[in-house]
Amino acid sequence: MSTSKYSKMISSKHGYKKTRIKNNTSDSDLFNLVMPKADVVGFKSKQGGISRQAISWAKFARLNNFYIWLFLAAVGLLGSIYLVAVDLIFKYVVFSWREAFMSLTENYFLQYLSFIAWTVALATGSCFIIKKICPAAVGSGIPDLKSIFSGFWNPFVVAPMVLLWKTIGLLLSYGSGLSIGKEGPYIHISATLANTLLSIKPFKSIAQNDTQRSQLLAACCALGVAATFGSPIGGVLFSIEATGTFYLISNYWRAFFTATVGAVGIKILLSNPSNDLLESFRTHFADLNLASAQLIAFIILGVLCGLLASLFISLYTKIYNWKKHNAELFKKITPFGEVIIVAAATAILSFPLKFLRLDHATAVHTMFTATPDSDNSEVLSELAVWTDSMPFNHGIILACFLYVVVKLVLTAVSITLPIPYGIYIPLFAIGSAVGRFVGELMLVLFPNSKEIYPTGYAVVGAAALCGGATRTVSSAMIILELTNDLTYMVPVLLGVVLSCGIGNLLNHSIYDCFLKNKNLPYLPFYKAKSDSLIARDVMKRDLYYVCQNTTLSQISNLLKRVDEHSIPVVSSDNDLQLIGTISTTTLEEVIAYHERLHSYSKSPLSLSDNGIDINDNDNNDNINNNQNNNNNNNNNNNNNNSNNQNNSLVSEAIEMNVLSDSDNDENNNLIPNIPINDNNIIIQNNIRNNNNNNFSDNNNNYNNNNYNNNNNNNNDNNTNNDNNINNNSNDINESISEETTIDLVQMELQNPWVVIDSSPFQIQETMPVRKIVFMFMMLGGNILYVTNKGKLTGVVAKTELVHQNNNKH
């Protein structure tokens, strides 16, 4: 059936455009004109090939994939520029100003006071930023990201404000001289920068939900380690181990791409040798002869580093718990009392011994390269001035021992402060001192050996202690890339594996301790009392649901009470058979749809005759004449037939689900609308598809009776058109009342924008809790619906499950 020639307003992205419809236009072609191409579901091309929607989705997928790689390249490039700039500020501004500040006087006592004042002032400023401006910038940032990547999205952790204040806070805290690092904040900054870029228009489409956004942020975390140590491969592995529980292989390539782009950017920016911040870590060892004595020494070093790592974590936990129970003690002094006390103590202990007040990069360089003949030998042999008879290696043994003890305690205390901090670099320096300590002992035991190099032991110790504390084997790859030397590859791997194994036997990693202390949700921490716990024991029985046959008032009241993104749909209140789930956004659109119908029914209805241009004044006069003379008994049969057909077109325009594409809808959530012109005239919309009769025939929830009556009376020449229009409006008013029953399943069949997920995650009441936890971790869902023979009996929410566990422990 073809439509007669008439003008129609077609919904488009920029409003309504006038389209002339020819006489031979079929209803199916007219439907394709009215409906947006991307929203036509199930319509095949004339050649019987792939549907138009499938083609558009294929193009969208290719474009989306291109934007993903473009986004990763942008993060790698911009992140490398940003982080290198921060490093240069540390080198040429913060540390230079500190030396200049201390050189204002040659008096030792005044220099001592200047060093204390500098440390206290910068640490207090960093604490002020955290407490008063941006609390989300506190700490390492890795535990928060770990919680996000496990499925608990927290937008405040990666907000754009965090990017700025985390950087400023880190400049103050790290520049103060506290025993902290910067790799954790660098990873956090990389993720925050990535999330900020995702808010830019070209990249909005690639992060359509929290899960996809989290995957992209996880891929960008490798940039932080690549910028800190110049280690793209180790950075990727570390980001996987430190922030992930289960990892997608597709994200593996993205992380490598981001880290590679970042590494290239860093190499270009630091091409000037004077700006190469990593050159001091390069080593050049002679070939290693792994004899039995040295092999045993490396094994002992790995075990020792594992024990020290566990001791460090236990010390941190005890200090944190003590501060938590005595928080009022510090508040009585000053809001920043704990920071002032720790900063002052750090400065007092560090200044007297030169090697203790070195920044961590210089300390590591000294441990890796200092020999009796090197230029920096006096740094670690400073204790030898106590006696002229003390050999170099005896002095350095004592220096390393003091460095390990003091730095281990200061680091454990410093990471309990409310400031931005990292943990990897100070552990790196402490581990190098432990390795150097063992190497110097080996040299004392075997003074005639020409194959023992204490500096090589320092490299192994640095990797082993970091691996034991963070439980990351990637520490081995980071140290090998950092030193650019594979001579000690086997001892490094051996030490890291032994250290991680010893640590796992004794306690959790330092990042897991951060997670627990901050009470962050994290599924792997969930521990059931016994394997006998099943879904019935932990499910929530107080249910919110919507019945298949419901009313607008019931939907409105339900939306006011629930916070979930989706609501289960059941057959009825009696049997509670689970049909599926529907999003709260869709329910809001259902209400908005009926409100639109209500508003249109109240507006004056005017009808355009077939073949009349609605923007033509003459044609508008004809329309008005038709309306004003509807009751004229002298009208000919053609006019009566035309007017009666117009009435049916009004009903059909309201009945059919014509989607309007609004410019104000940023999310492109298409809500049904009836096209009208500027004079509130409903435009004719005879768009029944003969090949898809169900689309129009099933659309009878609101004015089906009126529609049929108009069709039956279509050839009646004596119909009063004004009365028909009024009857249409009255029927619409009745159909959209708040107590009118709405069949959601029927609406889904009739409207492509109403989507009911007919296969939500369902579990039986007898499923063990350990399996439920595993499902949450692997599938990434938020809610599991508990059913018994299809009947909805409860829900298990991931967030509530974790919060219950945190409250118990």
Curated annotation (Swiss-Prot):
InterPro entries named in the record: CBS_dom (IPR000644), CBS_dom_sf (IPR046342), Cl-channel_core (IPR014743), Cl_channel_volt-gated (IPR050970), ClC (IPR001807)
Region (Disordered) residue spans: 604-646, 692-729
Sorted UniProt keywords: CBS domain, Chloride, Chloride channel, Ion channel, Ion transport, Membrane, Repeat, Transmembrane, Transmembrane helix, Transport, Voltage-gated channel
Major place of residence: membrane
GO molecular function: voltage-gated chloride channel activity
One Pfam family, short name: Voltage_CLC
Cellular location(s): Membrane
GO cellular component assignments: chloride channel complex
Span of domain CBS: 539-597, 756-809
Regions of this protein lying in the Cytoplasmic compartment: 1-65
Keyword Transmembrane helix: yes
Topology in membrane: Multi-pass membrane protein
Transmembrane segments: 66-86, 110-130, 152-172, 218-238, 246-266, 295-315, 333-353, 395-415, 425-445, 459-479, 486-506
Function noted in UniProt: Voltage-gated chloride channel. Chloride channels may have several functions including the regulation of cell volume, membrane potential stabilization and signal transduction.
Family named by the database record: Belongs to the chloride channel (TC 2.A.49) family.
Protein name: Chloride channel protein F
